[in-house]
From Swiss-Prot:
Pfam families: YsaB. It is a lipid-anchor. A lipid is attached at residue 18 (S-diacylglycerol cysteine). This is Uncharacterized lipoprotein YsaB. The gene is ysaB. Its main location: membrane. It comes from the Bacteria. PROSITE patterns: PROKAR_LIPOPROTEIN (PS51257). Keywords: Cell membrane, Lipoprotein, Membrane, Palmitate, Signal. The lineage of its organism: Bacteria, Pseudomonadati, Pseudomonadota, Gammaproteobacteria, Enterobacterales. Residues 1-17 form the signal peptide.
Length: 100
């Protein structure tokens, strides 16, 4: 008798567990930076790199732009093939220039 009720309860628990819907997966929100803001960031990066490498901004090439969770990075190089990375915060404010 106890076995009959035990089996019935176990089957009911198994069925209830199978019918529960999984919670929706959360996706990270990606904020889009405006094209004008990107151009401002590029100009600032070129100006900072030109000052650091003692050259003109027209001799600086920005080759890449990456967006991370809370920041942006712009990669580039000089006409002498010296690499650098400009870092910006989530609002697009310049943080620092790293020479590579």
């Amino acid at each position: 008798m106890i076995m009959k009720y035990f089996c019935t309860v176990m089957i009911a628990i198994a069925l209830v567990g199978c019918t529960a819907t999984p919670p929706p997966t959360q996706k990270a929100q990606q904020s889009k930076v405006s094209p004008t803001r990107t151009l401002d960031m590029e100009a600032l990066c070129k100006a900072q790199a030109a000052q650091r490498y003692n050259t003109g901004a027209q001799k600086i090439a920005v080759t890449g732009f990456e967006q991370f969770q809370g920041s942006y990075e712009m990669r580039g190089n000089t006409f002498r093939k010296e690499s650098f990375v400009c870092s910006f915060d989530a609002d697009g404010q310049f943080l620092h220039l790293s020479m590579r």
